[in-house]
Each structure stands twice: as C-alpha cells, then as structure tokens.
Amino acid sequence: METSKLFLLSSSLLLVLLATRPCPSLSERCNPKDKKVLLQIKKALDNPYILASWNPNTDCCGWYCVECDLTTHRINSLTIFSGQLSGQIPDAVGDLPFLETLIFRKLSNLTGQIPPAIAKLKHLKMVRLSWTNLSGPVPAFFSELKNLTYLDLSFNNLSGPIPGSLSLLPNLGALHLDRNHLTGPIPDSFGKFAGSTPGLHLSHNQLSGKIPYSFRGFDPNVMDLSRNKLEGDLSIFFNANKSTQIVDFSRNLFQFDLSRVEFPKSLTSLDLSHNKIAGSLPEMMTSLDLQFLNVSYNRLCGKIPVGGKLQSFDYDSYFHNRCLCGAPLQSCK
C-alpha cells in the first residue's frame, strides 16, 4: 500500500513538473536569426518603452509590434506606431529577409534618411514611413522592390525630385508622397506605370512645371496634386472614358479653358479651386454624380448649368470667379 501511495505521489509531481516546464517546440516558434536582428533593432533605438516586450527570454513571435508567418515562423511584419522613440531607422531592419510589412509611423523623433538596407527586403508589399521627421531624398531603390503594393512616405521632411523609376513598380496600388518638401517636375514616366495605375498623392509639396503629356493616358482612381506650383494645361488629363473618381488639383497655377473639358463619368469629387482656369462650366457636368465640387478662385464666366448635383453645392463652391452666375450664385443679368 505504501509503495502504491509513493508511486502515485511521484507520478503526480512528475506531471506537475512537465506541465510547468516550457516545451521548446511550443514556446519558441521564433527563428533565432530573426530574434537576434530584432534585439539589435531595439538596442539601436535605445531600448524604447514601446519595445519593452522584446525580452530575449521569450518567444519573439509574441512580441509587440511584430508578426510571424504561421507556417515558417519567420518575422513578416514590423509595425512601430505612435510611441516615444527617437533616433534613426536601424540598418538591421534590412536583415529581416521575409518582411512583407514595414511600418514606422507617427514617430516625431524619428530622424535621418531612409536607409539603403531596406532595398534588401525583396518580399516587401507594404511600406509606411510616415508622420516622422525623416529627411533626405525619396530613395530610388524602392523601384527594386517589385512586390510593393503600397508605398507611403507622407508627412515627412523629404526633399529633392521624385525618382521616375518608381513607375517601374508593377504591383503598386497607391503612392503617397504628400506633405514633404519635394521639388522639380512630376516625372513623365508616371503617366506609364509598369502595371496597375496607382492612386497618386503628391499634395503639399513644391513641385513645379507642367503636367506630363503622358498623363493623357493616366487613369488612377485618386489623383491629388493640390498645393504645389504646377502650371500649364491640365485639360489633357481629363477624358470621359476614364475611371478616375477623386481629383484634387487645387492651389496651383493651372491655366486653361474649362469650357470643352469632358470629365470622367465616374467622377465623384472635383477640386479645381485657386488656379487661373478660364472659360465656363461644361454642360456635361450635370450628368456627373458629384459628392464634392469646388471651382472657386478662378477666372470662370457664364451661367452655372442647371441640373444634376450642381445646384446642391454651396455658394463657396463657386465664388471668387470673374463672372460666373446662376444658382447658387446671383442670377445672370
């Protein structure tokens, strides 16, 4: 009897020990090479609080700001967002070879240039380096990352010209370079992207020159060139057969006759305000299902066409033109 009790007690203790002891195959999924790189990144950023969970004694697949592939257990996502973090993007980021998502966002103390080491990450699909104090040029090496579908470098201090080689990205769906200090013309190659046509966000820069003639065939879903120093004839961009929905060309120096422009039938938002556009509003605008319209602060004349959504917009959408009249403005004489 005593022997049986002793056996049961020993068995129970053994089960407790096995249950509380971590099993290496279950507790440590993270690839050791990836863990080493992540710890290097943490050290380079001076061990910020946002990365406090990056403990070398725990599985890095469970760390905050990272994700692992469910099959390979390699790090495929690094997202550092809105924390007290300072310094530069560490070169070690380029040593996470299976990374598909790279995000450093809303980090006002992140400085320096975008490191060339990122060019090694051939699996990248999404890059968001935005709302930081990154400076320097927009790197041309992004054109080597052929799997990119989303590139967001907005709200930074980037300067210099836009690399035309970005048009070589065959899968790009959206390009955000807005709210920087970029200069020079829009590359002619942007009218001929290698694959799908990305939504183009270039607003709040210091871009100058004319719209490339290649934009005659450019058909993005969204096109925002507002608040630059662009000039010339913008009418080449518009075509009734395009599928563009949102257009903002406001606060530039565009100068052309609006009278015969044929807007895309798909257009839902149009902002041409604060330019030097002359002529009259085309009658075909009454057929558009516009949700937003602003043509104020131009040199337009004539009667606002009656019909469609044109009378649903406020006075502010039309005022400060040369001699535009009709509802919602004053009656034509």
Curated annotation (Swiss-Prot):
Start-end of each LRR repeat: 72-96, 97-120, 121-144, 145-169, 170-192, 194-220, 221-240, 241-263, 264-288, 290-312
Q: Which InterPro entries match?
A: Leu-rich_rpt, LRR_dom_sf, LRR_N_plant-typ, PGIP
- One Pfam family linked to the record: LRR_1
Task: Report how it sits in the membrane.
Answer: Peripheral membrane protein
The family this protein is said to belong to:
Belongs to the polygalacturonase-inhibiting protein family.
Functionally, this protein is described as follows: Inhibitor of fungal polygalacturonase. It is an important factor for plant resistance to phytopathogenic fungi.
Q: Which PANTHER family match?
A: POLYGALACTURONASE INHIBITOR 1, POLYGALACTURONASE INHIBITOR 1-RELATED
**Name this polypeptide is given:** Polygalacturonase inhibitor
Which gene name belongs to this protein?
pgip
